[in-house]
UniProtKB/Swiss-Prot annotation:
GO BP annotations listed: ribosomal small subunit assembly; translation
Name of the featured protein: Ribosome maturation factor RimP
Chief localisation class: cytoplasm
Function according to Swiss-Prot or TrEMBL: Required for maturation of 30S ribosomal subunits.
The entry's keywords: Cytoplasm, Ribosome biogenesis
């Protein structure tokens, strides 16, 4: 992923989504096969619909076409992050307390790098998860500096 491109796009997208009372969740710029994709994920407390995605896409496309900061031809995709939205910002982690989350760590904690459970707390430096292992429950502390990525998890 080209970090510079995502930072530039975030700077263009942030005022657009704020003006529409939406939240910028994430920006991805990836090459798949021969094509480049610029994916912008937006959300709000009530969720987002196709009209809101279209409005952000139209405004962002105009702004990016005018300034032309991206070196390759690309496909722009504006969408909701979905039910398993990534947890990236402080606010995301705070809002995830009490919900099911999936966390991948950079290095093993208690011999594991993948965890899925209910987030019991988040204090800015540590996540406390309640894991269910067969019929047992276990609390685990995960330091934020060990978190490679985190997302909400859907359970059935």
């Amino acid at each position: 992923m080209d970090k510079k491109v995502t930072e530039v796009v975030e700077a263009f997208a942030q005022p657009i989504v704020e003006e529409l009372n939406l939240e910028l969740v994430d920006v991805e710029y990836v090459k798949e096969g021969q094509d480049w994709f610029l994916r912008v994920f937006i959300d709000s407390e009530k969720g987002v619909d196709i009209e809101e995605c279209g409005a952000v896409s139209e405004r962002l496309s105009e702004a990016l076409d005018k300034e032309d900061p991206i070196p390759h031809l690309y496909f722009l995709d504006v969408s909701s992050p979905g039910a398993e939205r990534p947890l990236k910002k402080e606010k995301d982690f705070q809002q995830a307390v009490g919900k099911q989350v999936a966390i991948k760590t950079y290095e093993p904690i208690d011999g594991e790098k993948m965890f899925e459970g209910k987030m019991l707390s988040y204090d800015g430096t540590t996540i406390t998860l309640l894991l269910t292992i067969k019929t047992r429950k276990k609390e685990i502390q995960i330091p934020m500096d060990k978190v490679a990525n985190a997302r909400l998890a859907v359970t059935f």
